[in-house]
């Protein structure tokens, strides 16, 4: 039996909260002073218009740049204060969906060689200096990123490297809090916490049981297995899965991965069991989980077989249900793309600031900027027919249209697909037949030109008015 992954439903225009400007993403920000709030609005727009450039280049002018540096250095300004209004805006988008996947992951930010930055910690080797970033990204099953729900950064001494599993447990606790908040506010959205192998922690499984025992609602979870755990029925998870009947096959396109892994088509067989796990330490309850084995039986010659074991609290009995959970897990790739945009597009590892606290404040701005690029990319792919004014300001899309088409813009906003392709063409996208939708790199480069186009069109209008 061969069965492709379930087709996703395409959301309609009413599904989305408009995200016209980066400044609106931090609407309601409270940095303790109206002038600081105003500076934050200006700064995120300036950085967002030139995300690949240094802060002085993006801001422009010594006085403006000094004001930006002063904001990042101010003790009343903190990363969570900057991100909080974006979290709130993201929550409003989350409420409009029946299922939202909350993917978490940790990435290193390497500042080795920048010894003048005060407060850096060690990374995986004692001579590597930097900090860690652990965001929670809200993603729909259609792979559209709705925004950040949480984000933490930290530094550590080398000897504390093994103590960071607590970040994953705390992350799940935070997702449960958001699920409870949604319930309190009358929203029926189902949240599914998602993590890769680093999140395979029995404490997370037990945490959900304890929350439910208190009579509170808890978030569901879907985690890739790292440990071949003991079960209460005897034997380990893997051996029991291999004995389970095959539900069928699925076929999907695997994106390019780390190292030299190429993008390719993958066909996997699916097996599933429901099994009680033996607690990993005293004091933890027995937790019954669903385990799904997705195994590539016949990989291409020279390629390693793609296989995963996924664990979840959700019931999975049919091929359709197992396929859905695997499709959800593949959505986790969006957080990897987010990290790529943050590092390669926003170049956050090149920040030249005096203290790690200022780095963290700058990271808060750049995370929102990186999310918007990811949102544009995936929204354009999944919903190309939506009007572009959902995500572009009027002067933005009109300026891009004028410069590209050399004609007056239409009264009705063009589609997202048309405008994003125009933007990406200024980032190297050739828009040839069969090229598909632009990727995030060409979009973030093209977005940097949009600001210049807007300024040029506005300057031309001023000159015309003066002549009249």
Predicted regions and their residues:
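Single, function-defining residue in the core of a domain
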Residues: 2-117, 125-132, 137-468
């Amino acid at each position: 039996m061969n069965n492709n992954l379930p087709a996703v439903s395409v959301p309609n225009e009413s599904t989305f909260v408009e995200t016209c400007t980066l400044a609106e993403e931090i609407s309601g920000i409270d940095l303790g002073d109206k002038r600081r709030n105003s500076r934050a609005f200006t700064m995120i727009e300036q950085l967002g218009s030139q995300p690949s450039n240094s802060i002085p280049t993006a801001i422009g002018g010594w006085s403006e740049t000094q004001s930006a540096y002063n904001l990042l250095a101010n003790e009343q300004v903190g990363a969570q204060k900057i991100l909080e209004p974006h979290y709130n805006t993201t929550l409003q988008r989350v409420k409009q969906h029946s299922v939202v996947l909350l993917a978490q992951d940790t990435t290193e930010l390497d500042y080795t060689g920048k010894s003048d930055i005060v407060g850096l910690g060690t990374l995986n080797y004692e001579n590597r200096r930097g900090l860690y970033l652990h965001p929670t990204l809200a993603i729909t099953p259609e792979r559209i990123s709705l925004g950040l729900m949480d984000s933490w950064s930290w530094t550590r001494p080398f000897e504390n490297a093994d103590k960071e599993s607590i970040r994953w447990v705390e992350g799940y606790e935070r997702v449960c809090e958001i699920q409870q908040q949604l319930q309190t506010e009358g929203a029926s959205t189902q949240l599914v916490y998602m993590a890769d192998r680093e999140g395979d922690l029995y404490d997370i499984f037990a945490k959900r049981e304890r929350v439910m025992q208190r009579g509170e609602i808890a978030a569901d979870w879907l985690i890739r297995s790292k440990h071949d755990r003991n079960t209460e029925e005897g034997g380990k998870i893997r051996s029991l899965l291999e004995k389970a009947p095959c539900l069928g096959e699925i076929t999907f396109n695997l994106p390019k991965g780390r190292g030299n892994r190429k993008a390719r088509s993958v066909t996997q067989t699916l097996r599933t069991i429901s099994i009680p796990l033996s607690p990993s330490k005293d004091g933890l309850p027995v937790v019954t989980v669903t385990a799904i084995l997705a195994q590539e039986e016949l990989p291409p010659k020279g390629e390693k077989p793609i296989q995963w074991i996924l664990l979840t609290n959700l019931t999975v009995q049919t091929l359709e249900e197992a396929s859905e959970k695997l499709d959800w897990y593949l959505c986790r790739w969006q957080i990897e793309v987010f990290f790529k945009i943050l590092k390669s597009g926003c170049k956050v590892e090149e920040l030249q600031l005096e203290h790690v606290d200022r780095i963290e404040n700058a990271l808060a701005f750049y995370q929102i900027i990186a999310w918007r690029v990811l949102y544009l990319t995936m929204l354009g792919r999944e919903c190309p027919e939506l009007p572009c004014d959902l995500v572009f300001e009027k002067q933005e899309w009109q300026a891009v249209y004028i410069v590209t088409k050399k004609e007056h813009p239409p009264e009705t906003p063009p589609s997202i697909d048309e405008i994003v392709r125009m933007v990406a063409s200024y980032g190297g996208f050739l828009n040839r037949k069969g090229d598909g939708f632009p990727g995030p790199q060409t979009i973030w480069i093209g977005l940097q030109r949009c600001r210049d186009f807007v300024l040029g069109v506005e300057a031309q209008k001023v000159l015309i008015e003066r002549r009249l």
